[in-house]
Design a protein with these regions (language model features):
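Short, acidic/turn-prone active-site loops that include or flank metal/cofactor-
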Residues: 111-115, 235-236, 349-351
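N-terminal accessory targeting/assembly segments
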Residues: 1-115, 430-434
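Switch I (effector-binding) loop of TRAFAC-class P-loop GTPase G-domains
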Residues: 2-3, 190-192, 196-205, 223-255, ...
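C-terminal-of-GTPase-core extension/linker across diverse P-loop GTPases
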Residues: 1-18, 22, 29, 38, ...
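Conserved C-terminal guanine-recognition region of P-loop GTPase G domains, centered on the G4
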Residues: 26, 33-43, 47, 70, ...
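Short alpha-helix plus adjacent loop in nuclease-associated cores
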Residues: 112-131
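Flexible beta-alpha connector loops of hexameric P-loop NTPases
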Residues: 24-29, 58-63, 121-126, 165-166, ...
Length: 434
């Protein structure tokens, strides 16, 4: 596509987007990727005034887009009064230096832009630590020769002197800070592991919402839990994990968690830093993969989510695909989607359409890992009374017969909970699992 200009309002950073395609057949994909980059730039508070898509067999080691294209890009940026040039790929430290010299303006890449958005969105201490760790790990190998704006990380100009001496100081301070932040995150991981262990002892199943950013996960979370978490038509609104209790129609309880949205080429440093959060997905009993049913790049987005799930060790978690925003589809588009993926759920979290059917599907999927048991309780025993109440929370009770101070309950119980159902009062004859 040709380079194009749009008008921008004042008092915002004016951005140029630059992409590269290695062949004519991939131009459409590269253009879609630039569209996504424009959304990221908007989320970061910039306004896009210039788009450039360069075609060449492979990236140039020095300037990524080639010397001639860098020269023409510099002229276009000057004409459009560009403040920041954003590349749709991760640039090497050498390419960043060359481009800043050639373009004479700030240059960042896709990774740095995503990190900036995460930094803006983080609200809790945990979220801020995770973003900071990712930013510092990204910055560390890019310090040599960067030469600008490092004083705010190194304690101010003059702490050690100019040039390489100051950069070495920055590097040492950053390594020290990385270690400190990592310790805080390790503490968070340990605390989360303890909380998961407690939940597992209660045997309340956990369902995690995962999906591409802006697929509607938080809107679905609000619909399922009757909460009012912030949901917006914007990227990466949810960074800090949310966990709420939900009661199924058969009276069983489950926990629903909302997680950070994924994106294609999610920076590895960010995935690593958010591992404490994403481990919640790896430990879930079921993952609901929320998909924007009307997204032009739907298949690519689905593949990106699956890659991140593999990276965080969640590839073995059962997944139910949930196509959201079906209110934006035509009847024919709905039918084609149902024919293509008959095992999936089709819903509209915004309107509430088919939410009840989704809840039934979740209950059914969770029931696959249950076993029918019959167990007798002594109603005079405090421990047994507590077990009865817990059984109603975690299992689907089929029958309840009471008499002579005893209660006999037949229920479909999660397999991992059965071993804990033998009561002290009735160690042998009290349970019949079949």
């Amino acid at each position: 596509m040709a380079d194009r200009h749009v008008l921008a309002t004042p008092k915002t950073e004016r951005a140029a987007l630059v992409g590269l395609t290695t062949g004519a057949g991939r131009r459409i994909d590269a253009d879609h990727s630039l569209d996504e980059l424009a959304g990221l730039a908007d989320a970061a508070g910039a306004v896009v005034v210039l788009r450039v898509l360069q075609e060449r067999p492979k990236p140039d080691p020095a300037t990524f887009i080639g010397s001639g294209k860098a020269t023409s890009l510099a002229a276009a940026c000057a004409e459009a009064r560009v403040d920041v040039v954003i590349f749709d790929n991760e640039l090497t430290p050498a390419q960043l230096r060359q481009l800043e010299e050639r373009l004479e303006r700030k240059v960042i890449d896709r990774t740095q832009l995503i990190l900036d958005i995460f930094a803006r969105r983080a609200r809790t201490r945990e979220g801020k630590w995770q973003v900071e760790l990712a930013q510092l790990k990204y910055l560390l190998p890019r310090l040599v020769g960067a030469g600008t704006a490092l004083s705010r990380l190194g304690g101010g100009i003059g702490t050690r002197g100019p040039g390489e001496t100051k950069l070495e100081t920055d590097r040492r301070r950053i390594r020290t800070r990385i270690q400190a932040v990592q310790r805080e995150i390790d503490h968070v991981r340990h605390r989360r592991a303890q909380l998961r262990e407690r939940r597992q002892k209660r045997s309340v199943p956990t369902v995690s919402l995962v999906g591409y950013t802006n697929a509607g996960k938080t809107t679905l979370f609000n619909r399922l839990t009757h909460e009012h978490a912030v949901a917006s038509d914007a990227l990466f609104v949810t960074l800090d994990p949310l966990l709420r209790q939900v009661r199924l129609p058969d009276r069983r309880e489950l926990l629903v968690s909302d997680t950070v949205g994924f994106i294609d080429r999610l920076p590895h440093a960010l995935v690593a830093a958010f591992r404490a959060t994403l481990e919640e997905v790896a430990e879930a009993d079921l993952a609901l993969h929320v998909i924007d049913a009307g997204a032009p790049e739907r298949d690519r987005q689905m593949a990106a989510v699956r890659r991140v799930l593999e990276e965080v060790g969640a590839s073995e978690v059962p997944v139910l695909d949930v196509y959201n925003k079906i209110d934006t589809l035509t009847p024919d588009e709905r039918r084609r989607l149902e024919d293509r993926d008959p095992a999936a759920a089709l819903i509209s979290a915004r309107t509430g359409e088919r939410i009840d059917a989704l809840v039934e599907m979740v209950a059914s999927r969770l029931a696959l890992d249950t076993r029918r048991v019959t167990i007798a309780f002594d109603t005079h025993n405090a421990f047994d009374r507590e077990q009865i109440a817990r059984l109603y929370r975690v299992a689907r009770v089929v029958s309840h017969v009471a008499g002579n101070g005893r209660v006999v309950i037949e229920a479909d119980v999660p397999r991992r909970y059965i071993a804990r159902l033998t009561t002290p009062a009735l160690p042998e004859e009290g349970i019949d699992a079949r």
